From Swiss-Prot:
Protein name: tRNA dimethylallyltransferase
Family membership: Belongs to the IPP transferase family.
Assembly description: Monomer.
Cofactor: Mg(2+)
Site entry: Interaction with substrate tRNA: T100, R124
Pfam families, alphabetized: IPPT
Record key words, sorted: ATP-binding, Magnesium, Nucleotide-binding, Transferase, tRNA processing
General function of this protein: Catalyzes the transfer of a dimethylallyl group onto the adenine at position 37 in tRNAs that read codons beginning with uridine, leading to the formation of N6-(dimethylallyl)adenosine (i(6)A).
EC number from the UniProt entry: 2.5.1.75
Broad class of enzyme this protein falls into: transferase
SUPFAM superfamilies membership: P-loop containing nucleoside triphosphate hydrolases (SSF52540)
Species classification: Bacteria, Bacillati, Bacillota, Bacilli, Lactobacillales
One GO MF term attached to the UniProt entry: ATP binding
Amino acid sequence: MIKVVAVVGPTAVGKTALAIKLAQAFNGEIISGDSMQVYRHLDIGTAKATAAEQAQAPHHLIDIQDVDQQFTVAQFVAAAQPLIQAIHERGHLPIVAGGTGFYLQALFDGLKLGADAPGDPQIREHLRQIAVEQGPQVLWQQLAAQDPVAASKIPPTNIRRTVRALEVIQVTGQLFSHQQNAGSQYDEYYIGLNTARPLLYERINQRVDNMVQAGLLDEVRWLAKRGGATLPAASGIGYRELLPVLDQPEKLAAAIDQIKQDSRHYAKRQLTWFRHQTTANWYDLVQHPEVDAQILQDVTAWLTEKN
């Protein structure tokens, strides 16, 4: 199995800096595991590694999509797997850094497209509305057209299962009937970064203020001119809150506060997910920056272990 390091944790805890340090120490290359950093031109709101940071180590899966393009978990896995193989064949260490938990789970554990698949409340509600307004048969016929195998196993009257199957197809870009969990082809080592919650929230609030000062509003205006809220990239935190109030300066302060709140909530969800779904080794580099030496020792020990 190929050894892969994964640097995970909530926003604003130092994942980018640690990934670069690991890449420099172990001849590594960094693969972004973030669903928003794939978008070109959206640098500030996605907390993308700066040009100076990217120059310190090879980076992959950053700036590969236009803002009007979807980027599904299936696309991520399809892009990341050959990258990991190529990095390994170069004799380098693949390092996946990012906060989109389901992407990493799909990569390391195999794509699960059933109950464990991600959901989208807006898509779900839209599909339910179709069932109410046009009848369950119309919804089931949509599924039959897109995934006949799944439709053959779901009665046309079962609205809940029909909605779930269509939701998974739209969110993941994969057929619902292609449920799989082939098991990992990788030996992954999860490094989890976190810090005390009050300090984490303080850092998140400061990061949002820094983003605004760095030109986040200009980035959102650029996005608005290209389709705004209709674009797949517009769903990200920082963009979705500001797009509706660009022409309402009196509401900007409240929107920025909302970004902070949404970011804090997202960080909490990230932590919950990684604690329950991974066997991460947790460290606090915010309060104890000297721990980076221990991380390097731990990775060294893991690298010397046989698969």
